[in-house]
């Protein structure tokens, strides 16, 4: 079985991989990092006009990092909007994924948080800097191979 976006991508010979459907019937697609920006633009034009959420996670110690996008197709008069989940995987050594800030502005803080916690660089993001951790923090706290420092001095806020 294929979702509507997946069927459309197949019809137009755009490379992706279906990872199946979740318990709510939402299809999850895997997109290569180098194809992500063009498929994001296509998804927006296709009608996925709302980025419900973006998050990231460490797949396994020493393994890939994943950036996950939950897109919704909001249309006037439709009670059950169409949704899709897209996963973009990046290599741990130099994790780079194109930013979708210029398509969905709501990705701004979410991509910054993923950068701050996991070290995924979102190319062409206008303000990619730490958002939760101090600028002086070393490392990426949500990576499975992260070693927490024994001591960290927090500066006063004057």
Swiss-Prot record:
InterPro entries from the UniProt entry: NADH_DH_suC, NADH_quin_OxRdtase_su_C/D-like, NADH_UbQ_OxRdtase_30kDa_su, NADH_UbQ_OxRdtase_CS
PROSITE patterns per UniProt: COMPLEX1_30K (PS00542)
GO CC terms of this entry: chloroplast thylakoid membrane
Main localization, broad class: plastid
SUPFAM superfamilies, A to Z: Nqo5-like (SSF143243)
Subcellular location: Plastid, Chloroplast thylakoid membrane
E.C. code: 7.1.1.-
Mode of membrane association: Peripheral membrane protein
Transmembrane segment boundaries: none
Keywords assigned by UniProt, alphabetized: Chloroplast, Membrane, NAD, NADP, Plastid, Plastoquinone, Quinone, Thylakoid, Translocase, Transport
Reactions catalysed: a plastoquinone + NADH + (n+1) H(+)(in) = a plastoquinol + NAD(+) + n H(+)(out); a plastoquinone + NADPH + (n+1) H(+)(in) = a plastoquinol + NADP(+) + n H(+)(out)
Catalytic EC class: translocase
GO terms, molecular function: NADH dehydrogenase (ubiquinone) activity; quinone binding
GO biological process: photosynthesis, light reaction
Pfam families: Complex1_30kDa
Oligomeric form and interacting partners: NDH is composed of at least 16 different subunits, 5 of which are encoded in the nucleus.
Function: NDH shuttles electrons from NAD(P)H:plastoquinone, via FMN and iron-sulfur (Fe-S) centers, to quinones in the photosynthetic chain and possibly in a chloroplast respiratory chain. The immediate electron acceptor for the enzyme in this species is believed to be plastoquinone. Couples the redox reaction to proton translocation, and thus conserves the redox energy in a proton gradient.
Annotated family: Belongs to the complex I 30 kDa subunit family.
Protein name in the entry: NAD(P)H-quinone oxidoreductase subunit J, chloroplastic
UniProt source species: Amborella trichopoda
């Amino acid at each position: 079985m294929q979702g509507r976006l997946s069927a459309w991508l197949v019809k137009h010979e755009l490379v992706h991989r279906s990872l199946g459907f979740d318990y709510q019937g939402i299809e999850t697609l895997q997109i290569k990092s180098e194809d992500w920006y063009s498929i994001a633009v296509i998804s927006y034009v296709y009608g996925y006009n709302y980025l419900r959420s973006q998050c990231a996670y460490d797949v396994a110690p020493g393994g890939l990092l994943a950036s996950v996008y939950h897109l919704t197709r909001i249309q006037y008069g439709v009670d059950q909007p169409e949704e899709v989940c897209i996963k973009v995987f990046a290599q741990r050594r130099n994790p780079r994924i194109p930013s979708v800030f210029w398509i969905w502005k709501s990705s701004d803080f979410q991509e910054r948080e993923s950068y701050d916690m996991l070290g995924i660089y979102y190319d062409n993001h206008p303000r990619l800097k730490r958002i939760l951790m101090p600028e002086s923090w070393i490392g990426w706290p949500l990576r499975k191979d992260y070693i927490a420092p024994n001591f960290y001095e927090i500066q006063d806020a004057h």
